[in-house]
From Swiss-Prot:
One of its GO terms (molecular function) is pyridoxal kinase activity. The gene is pykA. It catalyses: pyridoxal + ATP = pyridoxal 5'-phosphate + ADP + H(+). The keyword Transport does not apply. It comes from Dictyostelium discoideum (Social amoeba). Disulfide bonds: none annotated. Homodimer. It is found in: Cytoplasm. This is Pyridoxal kinase. InterPro entries: PM/HMP-P_kinase-1, PyrdxlKinase, Ribokinase-like. ATP binds at residues 181-182, 215-227. It comes from the Eukaryota.
Length: 302
């Protein structure tokens, strides 16, 4: 079956976050994707103001019902979910995932549990329990950042071993593939650490295949949408390399780093009076990195 993704997350008119990233990246990897926009805003919320609306659970259900009524749901091979801002909407998303899995038991669910960053939540706190107890146990892949891992597991991560303990909790919830997408350790102040783990299907003594990737030097600037973009790149490369999570991460992370670097280098053309929230990822200008990816950062086994 030809890969086809249903992506349920946010959309902005200007800039690149959520589905605006995912659709671009997946299509440039040659993958069909249908977006459902859980939120539709004028721009991301780092700007001084924004306008728009959230999709209600009923309207989300209606959109999916329209796809079902026209027999368009049986061809989905993957579901990608990202930002959702209410328990009710998240429950509706989960119903959609379960419905699709009932139609296609081989369907892969990729969950980016968007909760927060930099030690803070930017969604209602009750979403944490819904993700932990209901959503994540149904996922085949999860791509949380450090803040999200700490809220979901209760483990404060200061080193590799802490990260692996948290990952073990996710595996016990039923998730086969886990990638913590950004870790910051005092021992590596100039790098971002990525740690991944997949349950080993082979009959040997190694229960998990685990690895880490050092990414650096890190950029001091903050760009919105990087996590959303990385999730879509990880999904895209997992379709190409379904049995090699470390290679998937090497490819996706290298692409993302090159895109951020392209964006960073373009700042000199931005007026000095502009605040950093105006710096949007230069996806169109960086499409060559998606289409012709070279590995920039190699993984090491843990």
């Amino acid at each position: 079956m030809e890969p086809k993704v249903l992506s349920i997350q946010s959309w902005v008119c200007h800039g690149y976050v959520g589905n605006k990233c995912a659709v671009f990246a997946l299509q440039h990897l040659g993958i069909e994707v249908d977006p459902i926009n859980s939120v539709h805003l004028s721009n991301n919320t780092a700007y001084p103001t924004w306008k728009g609306e959230s999709l209600t659970p009923n309207k989300l259900g209606d959109l999916f019902q329209g796809l079902e009524d026209n027999h368009l749901t049986s061809n989905y091979t993957h579901v990608l979910t990202g930002y959702n801002n209410s328990v009710q909407t998240l429950h509706t998303v989960l119903k959609i995932v379960k419905k699709l899995k009932s139609e296609n038991p081989n369907l892969i669910y990729v969950c980016d549990p968007v909760l927060g960053d930099n030690n803070e939540l930017y969604v209602p706190e009750d979403l944490v329990e819904v993700y932990k107890n209901e959503v994540i146990p149904n996922a085949d892949y999860i791509f949380p950042n450090q803040t999200e891992v700490e809220f979901l597991t209760g483990i404060k991560i200061k080193n590799d071993q802490d990260a692996l303990k948290a990952i073990d909790q996710f595996h016990k919830m039923g998730v086969k593939n886990v990638v913590i997408t950004s870790l910051f350790f005092d021992t590596n102040p100039n790098d971002i650490i990525v740690i991944g783990s997949t349950i080993n299907d082979d009959d040997n003594n190694n229960k998990y295949n685990q690895f880490k990737i050092k990414v650096g030097p890190k950029f001091n600037d903050y760009y919105t949408g990087t996590g959303d973009l990385l999730s879509s790149l990880l999904l895209g490369w997992s379709i190409r390399e379904p049995t090699d999570l470390s290679l998937v991460c090497e490819k996706a992370i290298s692409i993302l780093y090159n895109i951020i670097n392209e964006t960073h280098n373009s700042k000199k053309s931005i007026p000095s009076n502009k605040e950093k929230q105006y710096y949007e990822l230069r996806l169109v200008q960086s499409r060559k990195f998606i289409e012709n990816s070279e590995i920039r950062f190699k993984s090491e086994k843990l």
